A protein has these predicted regions:
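SAM-dependent methyltransferases
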Residues: 1-10, 152-157
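Phosphate-binding/catalytic loops
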Residues: 102-157
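Nucleotide and nucleotide-moiety/phosphate-recognizing core
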Residues: 6-14, 21-78, 82-86
Length: 157
């Protein structure tokens, strides 16, 4: 789902993840929670699902891109890191099920020329879950916190 206010100083908030794999869908759940918030002009929400090259166009039309994604990095589930990745090598070593697709997408994004500012909120998960739409209690608790951090990042731009 895409919601847009204007094209002036456009900020794209892009949630990545598979909501059929529990905690792995954290990025999409954060975007869904932000849909209930009155967003400032120029802020757009996009459910990026498991990522694909179809996301290049909305990413390139933004002045700033804020990504929210899950990572299996050994940190406590629900830990949040704010990163400024430039290339796929700047991402956490172990992203989850869509690892290669998202990293390839970021590399292609920068190779195509227009490079808006990118911020990644990497949310640690414990493990991949098979076929469940429910997130763990730890991840459910962190959704409002991550949504707040993302909104703060968008407002600061």
């Amino acid at each position: 789902m895409m919601t847009s206010k204007t094209d002036k100083n456009k900020v794209l908030i892009l949630g990545i993840g598979n909501t059929l794999m529990g905690d792995e869908g954290i990025g999409v759940h954060v975007v869904n929670s932000l849909e209930k918030t009155a967003l400032p002009d120029g802020v757009e929400l996009l459910d990026g699902g498991t990522g694909s090259f179809l996301l290049l166009e909305p990413m390139q039309s933004a002045d700033k891109v804020i990504l929210i994604d899950a990572t299996i990095d050994g940190a406590k589930a629900g830990s949040v890191r704010r990163l400024h990745p430039r290339y796929s090598k700047d991402y956490p070593k172990t992203l989850t099920a869509h690892d290669i697709g998202l990293k390839d997408l970021i590399d292609a994004f920068y190779l195509m020329g227009k490079t808006p500012e990118v911020t990644l909120f990497a949310v640690s998960i414990e493990d991949l879950q098979d076929l469940t739409t429910e997130m763990s209690p730890d991840l459910n608790k962190v959704v409002p916190k991550v949504a707040g951090l993302v909104l703060e990042e968008a407002l600061a731009f």
